[in-house]
């Protein structure tokens, strides 16, 4: 969140924008950034967008799940789905404070029965595969159109 906040102007070009989709947070968790620091950064990002693009809808996606299987430990590192869900709850609460922000819960659409990122949907336990992105895009369709 900190890096996006620092470089937000580089990602937004000043033209008319209908919707902005934010999918951020997993790198903060991987770097052990405190949730309050990430929330402060996220709120600053939302406020900056709301100030510069007052008619733009902001879609805040839930942080995606990881697969905590042993074969993925090196990539997933310290991320856990329990921590991700805690952050997602905090994201949802933050989003509810802003009329222009809608929280988009996509976490469950990517998990298996054990609550892990489905192996078919990941390349390394953290990043999505083509199949994972297809499921994500299907989950987003109702929120974007």
Regions found by a protein language model. Give the residues of each.
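Catalytic His-Asp segment of secreted/periplasmic serine-dependent ester chemistry enzymes
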Residues: 66-145
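Structural recognition of the beta-strand scaffold that forms the well-ordered cores
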Residues: 19-24, 28, 57-62, 102-105, ...
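Generic hydrophobic/packing signal
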Residues: 17, 39, 57-61, 128, ...
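Phosphate-binding glycine-rich loops and adjacent basic patches that engage nucleotide phosphates
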Residues: 1-11, 48-57, 96-105, 131
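Conserved SGNH/GDSL esterase-like catalytic core that processes O-acyl groups on lipids
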Residues: 1-47, 82-85
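Sec-exported extracytoplasmic/periplasmic mature domains
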Residues: 9, 13-16, 25, 43, ...
């Amino acid at each position: 969140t900190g890096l996006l906040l620092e470089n937000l102007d580089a990602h937004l070009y000043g033209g008319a924008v209908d919707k902005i989709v934010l999918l951020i947070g997993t790198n903060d968790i991987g770097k052990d950034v405190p949730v309050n620091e990430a929330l402060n950064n996220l709120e600053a990002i939302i406020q900056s967008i709301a100030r510069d693009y007052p008619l733009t809808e902001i879609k805040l996606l839930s942080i995606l799940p990881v697969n905590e299987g042993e074969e993925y430990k090196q990539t997933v590192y310290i991320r856990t789905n329990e921590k991700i869900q805690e952050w997602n709850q905090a994201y949802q609460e933050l989003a509810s404070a802003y009329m222009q922000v809608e929280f988009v819960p996509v976490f469950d659409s990517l998990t298996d029965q054990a609550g892990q990122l489905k192996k078919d949907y990941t390349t390394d336990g953290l990043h999505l595969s083509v199949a994972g992105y297809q499921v994500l895009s299907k989950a987003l369709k109702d929120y974007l159109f």
